[in-house]
Amino acid sequence: MSMRLPAALGATAATWLVTACLQAPLALAQTPPAAPAVAITDQDISDAYIYLLGRLLVTRQQQLDFKDGMQWNTLYHRKPGAVDWPNPNLDVAYSEAWVGIDEKSCTQVTVPKVVDRYYTVQFLNGWGETLANINEREYPEHPNGEFAVCLKDAKVSLPADTQRIDVPARTLRVLSRVELGKDWSEAERLQHQFKMRPSGSPQLPEVPKTLIFEGQKLPGVEAFDSATVALQEPDINPGMEQVQAKVRAIAAAIADPAERARVDKSIHTQAFADIAKASPIIGHGTARDGWARPATVGTYGDDYLTRTLVNYGGIWANTQKEVIYYRGGQDANGKTLDGTQSYSLTFPGKQLPASMANYYWSITATNAKTFLVLPNSLNRFSVNDQADLKYNQDGSLTLHFAPSKPQDVADGNWLPTAPGQIYRLVLRFYGPKGDVASGEYFPPVIKHL
């Protein structure tokens, strides 16, 4: 096939064009080779591992839940204390579910009328981010009755008087909490009135088959074998593309045995060290007088480090509007709490914990490694505002943590500990207010007796 040059093209220009075409192969041959791929650094590996681990902790629990018999869109009412995840709140009756929704089906939730008792129905996505709460604080004009949790923009016809709640996720973890208070039987009666059902026939998600590992034994390079499946769940937080690209790059690179070994070594050195360094302040939190308070919880933005640490040490945490957590792990001398020893904690009369919570407060002691409550013959695992507390003459409140009840200490002021176990205290304020809500408050020092 011949090619005719436009008549308007001058002879000089035509000569130049032909010469350029003839020389093109030579020019291409002289093009420098592409730069080698950028090496994956130890910091890249640490960042990617910590990010991915946060998701794997959720999928691990999801697989365990379904193995234990849970089914989609079914609310399971648990007996008080009968839950199996790190740092549960033992002051509430829990109900739990996994929810699947799509463009044509919502999940309907019935909430009973609850008076003078804390309650909420919390919805989280597959990364441990809280998407919604149903309670009288979020819906003061519709605190109970019928609700429908729907995929955003889903076209679903709902019954009248149903409060629709749109969420950006197809898979949801649900926790319903009802404060036990002094009348546990009433709390359990209310708990069983919370109900859940799909509005139609949703296309149910598959339970992701990712790595299952022991809670106290973090995985190494094998975590990245699950990267493709794990990242199928969208992360709603902005700016995660770069760290997700690192995850995918490492998952591809470890096909080479030598690179796999290098990544594994890097995880066990730098990534684990970075986690250990961030743990005392729960990511980017603050520590004071032996207590740590996370900078955020429940919703994390770009702080995936804190999200992963919370998923590891206290999965399903709610937002700071609902509850604020303080973790106490050291006494006034900076030494870790030992179940063999005796300690005291005194709240001044002007800063009693009840004055900083709209609903209630509690303190729980858990093993520092397993995050499970400390076993004791009394089966007493927390102290809260429902206990038979005795106040000091000056109005202050002193609590005791010891393997046996100290002399002249009221029974309600004592939380038993387990000899030989290193532990930490978790102080919760439900409906935080005042200096707790603003972040200015920190609990008093824990004194070694």
Task: State each model region's role.
Residues 30-449:
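A compositional/structural signature for long, glycine/proline-rich flexible linkers
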Residues 4, 23, 30-34:
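Selective for proline/serine-rich intrinsically disordered segments
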Residues 16-27:
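C-terminal segment of classical bacterial N-terminal signal peptides
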